[in-house]
Amino acid sequence: MGLFDKVKQFANSNNNNNDSGNNNQGDYVTKAENMIGEDRVNQFKSKIGEDRFDKMESKVRQQFSNTSINDNDSNNNDSYGSNNNDSYGSNNNDSYGSNNNDSYGSNNNDSYGSNNDDSYGSSNKKKSSYGSNNDDSYGSSNNNDSYGSNNNDSYGSNNNDSYGSNNDDSYGSSNKNKSSYGSNNDDSYGSNNDDSYGSSNKKKSSYGSSNNDSYGSNNDDSYGSNNNDSYGSNNDDSYGSSNKKKSSYGSNNDDSYGSSNNNDSYGSNNDDSYGSSNKNKSSYGSSSNDDSYGSSNNDDSYGSSNKKKSSYGSNNDDSYGSNNDDSYGSSNKKKSSYGSSNNDSYGSNNDDSYGSSNKKKSSYGSNNDDSYGSSNNNDSYGSNNDDSYGSSNRNKNSYGSSNYGSSNNDDSYGSSNRGGRNQYGGDDDY
């Protein structure tokens, strides 16, 4: 044991009082006197006088009572990695990687990848981030304005700041006017304005209008132009892809929107739905099986949970953006409008899917027969089921019902199947 160890042992065992009950063995002075020896203490006391000795002893005891050399205190400030301010990696403000404000990767406000407000890929509930489950996030599952979430302002909603919303310069729009998914504004999603998402014509068009350029109209440049392609691409297949094989939006794979693997959904690398990441049949942004757009149950329609009678864009031969020759925004030569019975109507029963105009069965960003962003056959929007846009059955489908005013089979909302009467919009032209 070293000298300093002895000193610390001596100091730490002191109780700084002169307790007669323990024969004065507890305080520093008594310990020191015991170490020196009683004979020497008495010699020193007699040399300087007992009064002076007692005064000196009292002062020494008082001094030692205010002194501590115990270094076992770990609650001090400014230690490396402690929970104090300005420490490296702590959970305080302005630290690197902490969960405080303005830190890199923390879960605080404005951090990169944190779950705070306005962070890239965070998971909090305010001020959206890319891929977080917050408000206004892309592909999140929480509140307002998220892409593919089950909250307000999700994909295709009429709120501000959603994917394809009617705001200025929203995702996929390049014009200067308000554009929204399927709105009747200038430059709406799939409209025939100057800069709408995937359109190339110059006239005003609205969702489901009978103009020359409505959403899925009969002009040459509607949503998913008049190529042999998908939504805004000049390919055979997926949504905005440029390859010639079944691919998704922005990928040259056989898959979903923005994914890079096979048989996937929009932005996922699974066999699933639009924006999901599991390997089972799931929906747009969900992680469950065989589901619809944003739902988590099995074999369902757009947000529903039943297994029959599909909804909007069922998985019949004609779902929303079905696998006709001219789906939603196709390039066929006949007049078509939202809900018409032409070869090109919105969700007709042609060979292709939503936004594709090729001759092979492909969906919105998938290489399947049907669905929007699915990667399997006969699927719905973002599912790999046998369904249409959010539905899961093969018969009796329409927008949330089993026919929706039609009397024929295998049709979707506003489809124009080839074997009978159409739904919602009559037999031929709108």
UniProtKB/Swiss-Prot annotation:
Regulation: induction: Expression is induced by DNA damage, as well as by salt, oxidative, and heat-shock stress.
Compositional bias annotation for Basic and acidic residues: 37-60
Region Disordered, residue ranges: 1-430
GO BP annotations, alphabetical order: DNA repair
Sequence repeat positions: 74-81, 82-89, 90-97, 98-105, 106-113, 114-121, 124-131, 132-139, 141-148, 149-156, 157-164, 165-172, 175-182, 183-190, 191-198, 201-208, 209-216, 217-224, 225-232, 233-240, 243-250, 251-258, 260-267, 268-275, 278-285, 287-294, 296-303, 306-313, 314-321, 322-329, 332-339, 340-347, 348-355, 358-365, 366-373, 375-382, 393-400, 407-414
Disruption phenotype: Shows a slightly altered sensitivity to killing by 4-nitroquinoline-1-oxide and to heat shock; and a 6- to 14-fold reduction of the spontaneous mutation rate of reversion of a HIS4 mutation.
Region (38 X 8 AA approximate tandem repeats of S-[NS]-N-[ND]-D-S-Y-G): 74-414
GO CC, one annotated term: cytosol
Post-translational modifications: Probably highly glycosylated.
Keywords of this entry: Glycoprotein, Phosphoprotein, Repeat, Stress response
One GO molecular-function entry: ATP hydrolysis activity
Residues recorded as bearing Phosphoserine in the entry: S183, S191, S314, S322
Purpose: DNA damage-responsive protein that may be required for maintaining the rate of spontaneous mutagenesis. Shows low ATP and GTP hydrolysis activity. Dispensable for acquisition of thermotolerance and does not play a significant role in recovery or protection of cells from acute heat shock.
Descriptive protein name: Stress protein DDR48
Gene: DDR48
